[in-house]
Amino acid sequence: IAEKHHLHKPVTEQSQYNLFERKKVEREYSRLWADYRYGNTIWSPLASGLLTGKYKDGIPDDSRGALKGYEWLQDRFTNQAEVAKVENLRPIADRFGCTLAQLALAWATKHPMVSSVITGASRVSQVVQNFEALGVIPLITDEVDEEMRAIVKG
C-alpha cells in the first residue's frame, strides 16, 4: 500500500509484550517479522510493574498502582493467581542472581522479534537495574524460556 501511494513504508511495530501479554508479538505479528523484516519496539515488558514482584503483599503506597488515575491497574496487581505466578518465577531469578525485573526484561529482550524495549522508571535505581538486565540475557536459554512460559501459563 505504501509503495502504491508513494509513501514511506513502515519499518517497525510497537507492541505490548511481556510474559503475560505475548499473543500480538508471537502470533499476530510474526509474519511482519518473517516476511518484511519489521522491527518491534515493545512496551510494558514488566507488565506495568507486576513482574517486579513488588505487588506480592498488596499495592505499595509509593507504586504506580496507588496513583490516582491508575485504578484500572489495581485488579491486575491484586489478582492472586498472577501474583503467585510472578512469585513462582523468583527461584529462576535467584538462580541467576538477578531481580525479577531483570529476569523479565532479559526474557522479553531475548525474543528474536524484539528490536528494542521501552522501559519505564520512577527512580534512578530502577534505570540502573534495567541496564543490568543486559547481563542476564545470555542466561535465558531455550530451556529457561520454556520453564518461564510454563510457570506463567500454569
Residue ranges of model-derived segments:
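Beta/alpha (TIM)-barrel catalytic core signal, keyed to glycine-rich beta->alpha loops juxtaposed to Asp/Glu
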Residues: I1-V152
